[in-house]
Structures are given as structure tokens and as C-alpha cells.
């Protein structure tokens, strides 16, 4: 939150708070909203739903798709979704994104909300479209 505020103060136009749903430093709803209010984009990584026992990353607790969708629902117009995949013993990144999109839709997010997070917002961040 402090870095998000400072980035805005010094004039950074685009910045991303990554892994907001990570078990290591899982952000609260209020923390996420405060970062967004400071101009941040929020990134949620679906790897949290794929790691755990029986995977290439067995030491981490798996998040439920319902909980992940709850994070994504906070502000889809200011969020991006990644898989953070590519590790040995984990699904291929494309398969991970496929699972993520399916989980978001099955947990009540609209197709438009999903499009914001996996298409429109990432394109905006890298300058391929205008807000």
C-alpha cells in the first residue's frame, strides 16, 4: 500500500501489485481497494489453485476456486489474471489459464468481467489499447 501511494505521488502512470491472492501475503479487500484508489492494477495468480500436494509445488496450500473468484470479483475493471505457471510438475500455462477462466465463470463472474482481466486490462497495461 505504501509503495502504491508513493508510485502515485512520484507520477508513475501504470503499476501492478502482484500476487494479491498469494498465501504468503494475501491482501485483504480493504488493502486491495486502497491500492486501486492509489492507481494500482491488481494481479491475481491462479497458481494458488493448482499447487499443493501431488504437484511440482507440494508445500503450498491450495486456494479454492470460490475464494479465487472472490478476489477477482473485487474490481475486475482494475485487475489482471495470470497463471504464474511454467514450473516442472505443474500444468502448462495455457491449460492453467483455461482452468482459471472456467473456474471464474463457474463461480459467478460474467464473461465481460473475465474479458477485462485476461484480455482488455493486460492490453491496456502494455499500451495495446486505451482506457
Predicted regions and their residues:
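Mid-to-C-terminal alpha-helical segments outside catalytic/metal-binding sites
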Residues: 95-131
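Divalent metal-binding pocket/active-site signature
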Residues: 1-26
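Active-site glycine- and acidic-residue-rich loops that bind
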Residues: 17-28, 48-66
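Ligand-binding pocket scaffold of soluble enzyme catalytic domains
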Residues: 32, 41-43, 49, 111, ...
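Acidic (Asp/Glu)-rich catalytic clusters
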Residues: 5-11, 31-39, 69-76
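Charged helix-capping and loop-helix junction motifs
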Residues: 2-4, 29-30, 59-67, 95-99
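Short acidic/histidine-rich active-site segments
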Residues: 45, 75-93, 114
Amino acid at each position: 500500500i505504501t509503495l502504491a501511494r508513493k508510485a502515485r505521488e512520484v507520477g508513475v502512470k501504470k503499476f501492478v501489485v502482484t500476487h494479491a491472492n498469494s498465501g504468503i501475503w494475501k491482501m485483504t479487500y480493504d488493502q486491495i481497494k486502497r491500492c486501486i484508489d492509489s492507481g494500482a492494477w491488481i494481479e491475481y495468480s491462479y497458481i494458488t489453485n493448482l499447487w499443493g500436494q501431488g504437484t511440482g509445488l507440494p508445500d503450498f496450500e491450495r486456494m479454492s476456486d470460490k475464494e479465487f473468484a472472490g478476489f477477482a470479483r473485487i474490481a475486475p475493471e482494475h485487475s489482471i489474471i495470470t497463471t504464474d505457471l511454467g514450473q516442472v510438475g505443474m500444468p502448462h500455462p495455457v491449460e492453467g489459464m483455461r482452468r482459471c477462466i472456467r473456474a471464474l465463470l463457474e463461480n459467478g463472474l460474467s464473461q465481460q468481467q473475465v474479458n477485462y482481466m485476461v484480455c482488455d486490462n493486460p492490453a491496456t497495461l502494455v499500451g495495446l489499447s486505451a482506457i
